[in-house]
Structure formats: structure tokens, C-alpha cells
């Protein structure tokens, strides 16, 4: 695998900023101290928050250089390091979420489980690993955990209790694949946006099912700017670009989806009055990274660090990151996009910092709200 895009200004303002970010995200005793109960998190989603489920469930090869930074090895994450969900867990001083499908090791999922699988959509609902299937997996997980916890006094405390499930945080980050696949099938913009109400309905139904299982605290991420992904830009011959070089139609569809998701959260706050529903504007955060990339020390914000093809996007669907012939940049910290679809650890760290700031949550809520008693 070749290496390209060398940069020498290692001690730039960006790296000073990055150190500050690390301190903010990973060393926040005030946040951790606010958790008076053990944090329990259940996550549902796609590759943006998959911490190894695709590899564990299907044996799909996600090899090096994925994971080359923090983990120093591939862990099944589609990034050079940590994902947003990893930084959020670390902000609470809790261990990183293990994939539900990863049965190896001695984990008992005491701090929750991750049901997210790369490539997962909301529709069709009965195809692995759609959101519907992930919620069914959770139902089985909960039932089995409570069964084991009640089977022996010696096992009490080793598994999540009924109160643990009730007080847990339920995170959902899904919908991107539904929109992207519609465009990939050749559907027009109008055909794609007609699917959005169905997608929103399925997400709402899944949240209500989790509520029926006892969940009361929900953390909902909207989708990012699809039209700014190097993968989409490299495959679509279009002059329909905005001032930052992103595809207007893709981003417009994502924006309409996000508006529907926001409205859904408003409805759920009325329908489920004893539940807390937090909506996070991930789109605004990620688009700001691209629009203000120089301020964050990024170069070529629409170019993948790992891929093939060089400028302007370094993405080729036939030679993707980690495959024979692909290249990888030396300093991923100068790139927003890792592989043309997913973000670098550096970009994820900045996204996490902004999520934790409460400026992008509706209503403004600290991430640790669910583990305060």
C-alpha cells in the first residue's frame, strides 16, 4: 500500500487545538463525577457507530490501516481510530461499547451493548441488520440478561438489572444508508425524498418498541452531509455543487430527512411524556468542519486519506481503503474523510467535542444526564 500526501507542519495551530480537544473530551472529571450510577448505553445504527459488529457477525474483512492510531490494529471500526461513540463513552470514563454479535472474550456487557452494523438501513425492515432486526436482538439480549441475573445469587450484579435497562441511554444513529442507496439505485431526488416518511416511521416505531421494553432516555443523531462524502462526489457526474464543493441534491435530501427526524422527536415528547428525547444535529457539526476546514487545520476536506485515485477525492469504488493498490496518507489528522465515507479519528474527536458542548442538542442536555440519580 502506497503512502502519499506528506505534510511537515506538525506543530501547527491545529495540533495545539487537538491537544485541547483531547483534554476536553477524555479528561473531564466533572462529567464523569456526575454519573452517580454506572453508565449503561445501548446503541443502534450503521457504520458510523459500528465498533466491530460487521466483522463479528459476518466475518467481513476490515483490516489495517483501519484502527492504526488509537488501537494500533484493526478492530472492525471503519476509521483510522476511534469513532464518535467511542469518545462519548470515554467522556463518561466507561469502557468502549462491545458489539452484541461479538461472543468472544469475557465481556458480560455490563455497560451496555452495541447493535450497530455497517451497512444497516431502516428499510426493508426484516433484512439483517436493519434497525428492526437490531431492536429484536436487543429484546433477546434483555430477556436473556434478566434470566441469567435471576438464575443465581452469585450472578447478581454481573449482568444488567431491570433498573439498569430502564435507566440506560438508548442511542440511535441511522438513516444515511437508506438515502444513499436510493440515489445509488438511480432514483431521482424526488423519488428519494418520497421514501423519507417511511424511514422516519420505522425509526419512530423502533423507539416506541424500546420504550415498551422499558427505555426512557433516548439520544437521536440526525444524518450528516451525504453530498460532502468523497465517495458520492467521485461517482456522480454533476455540476450541482454548492460553494464548498458538496452535492446539493444529496445534502438537500439529508436535510429533509433531518427535519422529519426532528419533528418525529417533537411528537414523541408529547406521546411519551415520561421519556427524555434528545435530538443531536450531527449535520450542522459535520458541515461546519468542511465549510471551515482551514480553521481546524484540515487540508483537502473533500479528499479521502485512504483510497485510490489521488486528487480531487482519492476514491475509487474498485480500489477502496485497505485493498490492494490503495494508498494511505501519512497524517490522517489533516483529513476529515478517512476512506471516502467515514471520518478520521481527528474529525470524530472534534464532532464529539461539539456534541458534548450541548450547542447542538435539542433540548440542550449534557451527555451524562442519563446516569445521574
From Swiss-Prot:
It holds the Pfam family Lipase_GDSL. Keywords: Glycoprotein, Hydrolase, Lipid degradation, Lipid metabolism, Secreted, Signal. InterPro entries: GDSL, SGNH_hydro_sf, SGNH_plant_lipase-like. It is found in: Secreted. One of its GO terms (molecular function) is hydrolase activity, acting on ester bonds. The keyword tRNA-binding does not apply. Its main location: secreted. GO terms for cellular component: extracellular region. Glycans are attached at residue 93. Its EC number is 3.1.1.-. The keyword Secreted applies. Coiled coil: none annotated. Residues 1-32 form the signal peptide. The active site is at 47 (nucleophile), 339, 342. GO terms for biological process: lipid catabolic process. Belongs to the 'GDSL' lipolytic enzyme family. This is GDSL esterase/lipase LIP-4. It comes from Arabidopsis thaliana (Mouse-ear cress). The gene is LIP4.
